[in-house]
Amino acid sequence: MFNFITFILFAVVCISYCHKSRGRRHFGDEYRINTPACDIVCEGQWKSEFHANFHKIYDTEYFEIPLDTAIVKNRANLKMFCSSTIQKYSCLRNECKIQRTPWSAEKHICVGHFDNFDRNINCLSLTDKYVQRECSNVCNSIKIEISQAEIDRMAEMDFSRQEKSEFVEQNKHCNVIACYQLCHEYIISKVCIDSAVAARSVVKSYYDSYLEREYTELNKDDQDELYSSFCRRVTPGQDENEFTANMTRYNNLTLDRMKNDIRSVFSILD
């Protein structure tokens, strides 16, 4: 049971600090419709436990993309993280009476797919050093461009400067996410021979769900036109040609370029 008296002061701090998280992390605003403080206490306790367990500040030192070393280092870390996460959702449900919560990375790992992560933790642990080093080197330096067709579409739709900026940033984000997914799946195939299929499925499910959340956030605000063709290409259930026609070849070339860069970095393992 969460100690609300102990953490109410922490909640006040969280109002001004904890919510200054990176844009890609979403703690649903709908939580605060009827319970403006209760959910913050649950979240604050969870982040406090994360810091105590892993000696990292969640909002600034934990990364959802790629999967953070703190979570996949070993089975003990995974279970410790998920035990605290399950407590958080129990707090939201029992103390705050919040029965429905949106997708989040920790919810995906610990509530929706814990058994899959647990079964494949050895492979995730073995590949983590490559993901954090080599994959990061590749994915943080990939060539990211906007097609001329989409530049023309933004002009035709009279995008504002802010909308253009958001479009470009979202496209970059999708490129980086897709790169990490491809890279992680590639290294799994090289390192985890016996469990490669299952481990790749775990990674694919995580990244697919992450991208689905990205689209949902834009669509919720009626801004899905800011989701680029490439973003739609790598997001399950989306049509890459919905807003800009004949983008398949361009997106194929983008993905092929990523795959070639990844293969080049890991050629020593071939």
Curated annotation (Swiss-Prot):
Residues of the signal peptide: 1-23
Organism: Caenorhabditis elegans
Stated name of the protein: Uncharacterized protein B0403.3
Domain of life: Eukaryota
Keywords: Glycoprotein, Secreted, Signal
Carbohydrate attachment residues: N246, N252
Record's GO cellular component terms: extracellular region
Compartments in which it is found: Secreted
